[in-house]
Amino acid sequence: MLRSLVGSEMCIRDRMHTANMMKTADFLAGLYADVIDRGLLLAGTFLHDFAKEREFTFSKLGLVTEYSVKGQLLGHLVMGAQEVSAVAAELGIPEDKSILLQHMILSHHGEPEFGAAVKPICAESELLSQIDMLDSRMEIYRETLAGLQVGEVSSRIFALDKRVFKPHELNG
């Protein structure tokens, strides 16, 4: 099933983002085992951005050049949900499971103003949305801190809506 859904190679950054999220999801699924269906959370986490690469067009060097027409019209959330629906039907996955996975993909941006088609309304979709936000924000911090000296404050970071301070050297 995963080979059918994922298809071509994902960007390295997207793969790292998903891998980081999978580790966090696995940990939090254990922490909240009384509320979370671990399998559903991990499946939704793995699939949440898999249509993202089809949202863009790429140069011969593999660099994003612009949004694809389909990416502009639908976006990766809708394209991902459509593919999950089609593949799940083809594989005989129960419709209720397919709908939950589609909901997780459609809601993982959390709020409509951040691109979500719907708000997350089950525990797994809420947790996926929070994990996605956490990992994306930490990546912004990683990139910003790498360009700062100890004791320096960055200019305003649009995606964070604030500045970033580097209080100490990084360990990594």
Predicted regions span which residues?
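Conserved structured catalytic cores and adjacent interaction surfaces
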Residues: 15-17
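Single conserved hydrophobic/aromatic residue that forms the stacking wall/gate
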Residues: 1-7, 11-12
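Short, surface-exposed polybasic-aromatic patches that bind anionic ligands, especially phosphate groups
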Residues: 21
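Divalent metal-dependent catalytic cores for phosphoryl transfer on phosphate-bearing substrates
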Residues: 27-148
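A Trp-anchored, charged/polar loop motif used as the substrate-binding/catalytic surface
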Residues: 24
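N-terminal intrinsically disordered, cationic/polar leader segments
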Residues: 129, 153-158, 169-171
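Glycine-rich, flexible loop/turn motifs
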Residues: 1, 63, 156, 160-161
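Long, highly charged low-complexity segments enriched in Glu/Asp and Lys/Arg with interspersed Ser/Thr
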Residues: 143, 160-162, 167-168
